[in-house]
Amino acid sequence: MKKETNVKRTGCYIRRNRFILGAAAGLLLAAALPFGALGAEKGWQMVDGAERYVDETGGIVTEQWKKRDGKSYYLDENGEIAADAWIQGTWHVDETGAMEKETWIYEDGSSQMAKGWYYLGPSGKAEKNDWKKLGDVRYSFDSQGRMRTGWHYENGDIYYLGDENQGYIQIGWRYLESDGRKRPAEGSVSKALVPGEPGGQWYYFNSSGKARRAEVGSYKESEIDGHRYYFDANGVMATGWRCVREQAKPGDGTGISRFVYLGGKDEGMLKSQWLETEERPWDSPEWEQA
């Protein structure tokens, strides 16, 4: 009986200690839980001196977008609001941390982004690898979202997008610095020269920004404002005597009918009247090629 009594008393003692230990464990568990797990309100809270977002479990939200007062904010790896920064190379937040939309951002090259202009669309995403009409002009953006400038080649077409203060398609006649013998490099900027200034060439860009150009080894005839012009494969307006036809006219044993005279450097128009000129077809570098 005494043993049985001890067993009962021991059993009673264990049950009491189970209760005591359970309560202590509960206190320890509460201390180990994330901030707010035991009743903290979900939403924006001041935690450790910074404004953070607490989820329904009481955890601090990290690397996510959260809204407040209609604006989106990005919470970094510490749960703090990112400010004046690029997010994943696609979005940009201002000094307050709010996502920016429908605005231009200029980078000077000191950040993760290359130097140049970027445009953030209605969703806040940077325009990338596409054309975008803003106002009355069209811009082109590369795969990183940077506004293209200078010469741009796409699907066989030639565009000129101006300098970093322009970046939009050029339309109409442009007299640009170029030797005319080869295409300028992608993205290179050509200085706009005064007509007649040495070192320049004439180009014509249509309403879509595409340069009038021919296939390699030939010339393209184009009528502009009632006048006929010829352009080579690089988009350069042809001048002087040029061999523009593959075959001479019947009865022409010299091949001179393959040539046309297009005037001086700043003319380029096809001449269809009698002219007195010191330039002769056989002085053209194309005469031997013909």
Task: Identify what each model region corresponds to.
Residues 2-290:
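Extracellular adhesion/carbohydrate-binding repeat motifs centered on closely spaced tryptophans
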